[in-house]
Amino acid sequence: MAAAADLVVPTLAIRSSVAVELWSSAGSKQPFEHKPHLPREETKSSRSICFSSNGRYFAYSNGQEVKVLQASRDSAASWPVICVLPRPKAFYLQFSPRGSYLCTWEHYAITKDRPEGSPNLLVYEVATGVEVFAIVQKNQADWQPSWSADESIFALVVGGEALFYDLGEGAEKGFATTSRKIGGSRGGMLSLGPGNCPPFLAFYTPGAKGAPSMCKLYKYPALGQNQTVACKSFFQADRVEMLWNKRGSGLLLLTSTEVDKSGASYYGNQAVHFMATKGDTCSVPLSKEGPVHCVKWSPKATEFVVVYGFMPSKAALYNLKCDVVFDFGEGPRNCAYFNPFGNLIALAGFGNLPGAVEVWDVSKREKLANLKCADTTVFEWHPNGEWFVTATTAPRLRISNGFKVYHYSGALLHETMWPQGQELLGIEWQQFADKTFSEPKITKAKHEGIKSSQPEASKKAYTPPHLRLLKEGKNPEKYLPQPSIPGLAPTAAAGGVNGNKRNNKNKQRSARKDVNVVNGGDADSAPTEVVDQAAPVARQSPVFVAAEERKPQHTPRQKYQPDNAADQPPNSYGQGHPNGQHISDKERKIRSVAKKLSDIKKLKVRRSQGENLELNQLNKIKMEAQYLDELKALKQSA
């Protein structure tokens, strides 16, 4: 494996806010960088880059045109331009399976010259750059046409109807006229299976007027009403994603609804169904409630993985009978990625998850590595099956853009952070034809790597600011800013008698209220006046002295003079504690019982006025004698 990897130079295609360029490395221990002989074009308007599946061609848009380059395996060879296509607004690019054709898609637009609109899906022959097909395709989500593996069949869905074009040897019509059609209802979807020639194909029809949604399998060219190979119907499906295995013998359907009528999920609900070209169909059993995050086929075409359920989600490996053959357990993950040989799988949690990545040996069912790839928006295995790249790209994240290359053991092989003010928009590996690399032998040996230049996030638990000083044994109030007024003493600004008259009045009312409750609610037993202890300090200021000289002297109102003022001890409640602070447990109990007696007194008044009381209120009145005895006992013990 190592020898094969050294013979082929790994190349990364990079699209940024300033250029489209290719980077390469001389080996696993050498850094990735742009070589002088590799293409680099400065452009701020590139929207798409694309390799053909066999790695022969590389295409990109630059805002003026689309260029197609011929790729080279030689580390010293250049990449010549094969053709230039006049598509300045190209938004998506896609090669046919063998790289003979390039499809371009751009946003549909209407102009004064062409009010009916211009074709926005075009197909070009790569060798000559000649346009061979053009059509209006308004659907952006499912714009990609379908191809058979040998490129003999070209198909696409327009307005819910699937159109087929025969391009094989001896075909007379080619792209000029459709050879077959199927469907016709709105929202239809088509997918041609790989591997077989002629291929199997799946056509999905959404449900309408109470009829269920339906997916049918056909063997091309037998597309008649009674020529279906398999059929699967389901009611809960507003949308479906069709996933073929590499051999084209099995199809997975990920169905989803936009709204969950049960209210269990904000994002609707999902289900996974399996269809085989032999005619078998079944639903994939899921043992945990919640959404289906990811479904992926193994390149071996005999197994598939499903990541599902509320967080922490579950991940399980299934066989072609839809039986669970291995359970990866639960964890913070929502993505799964098989390497090109299917002997390694990476389970990851990206998006709103912290970026934990687990690498598993699929054949031995054991975990090989745990690593953290925070803020990852792109994950892709290298064709050699041993490396993978992770990247943080815009517009998903516009800060800390860059990419890293890892070995499956978790070792970091390369790291490049994008310069400040620039954005990394896209990155992908050069593809290679089958059997270019041999399947790697998986070992537990740790690979030598480099240390990341990015600081690691703190693993300590978050502590709120108001608790940080308490953990250090300090009083937080000591560090709070104190209010101050120029020319006044600090204590006066903090709330002396004359510093804030409203606060002083509130304190007096609070103190009188507390004493009223203790004395049974008699207002005449309240203290004469509550004196703020900060007042003498505040009056030391010249400003307050002058204010006191001008202030008229008023005697306290007689209604607040207590009848037993001379008999009250100096430290009685209300005088010793003007703000109602530091009261004893016994005083607190007296307050509570007095409050209950006050409520009973009000209830009795309401009853005497003819008001009908509730049963619990009548029971409360019956407790009056018990509360009076309790209050008497508390006062005697005091």
From Swiss-Prot:
Coiled coil: none annotated. The modification Phosphothreonine is found at residue 463. Residues 492-501 have a biased composition (Low complexity). One of its GO terms (biological process) is translational initiation. Keywords: Initiation factor, Phosphoprotein, Protein biosynthesis, Repeat, Translation regulation, WD repeat. Residues 441-593 are annotated as: Disordered. It holds the Pfam family eIF2A. Residues 441-450, 583-593 have a biased composition (Basic and acidic residues). InterPro entries: TIF2A, TIF_beta_prop-like, WD40/YVTN_repeat-like_dom_sf. GO terms for cellular component: cytoplasm; cytosolic small ribosomal subunit. WD repeats lie at residues 287-329, 331-370. GO terms for molecular function: mRNA binding; ribosome binding; translation initiation factor activity; tRNA binding. Functions in the early steps of protein synthesis of a small number of specific mRNAs. Acts by directing the binding of methionyl-tRNAi to 40S ribosomal subunits. In contrast to the eIF-2 complex, it binds methionyl-tRNAi to 40S subunits in a codon-dependent manner, whereas the eIF-2 complex binds methionyl-tRNAi to 40S subunits in a GTP-dependent manner. Belongs to the WD repeat EIF2A family. This is Eukaryotic translation initiation factor 2A. It comes from Drosophila melanogaster (Fruit fly). The gene is eIF2A.
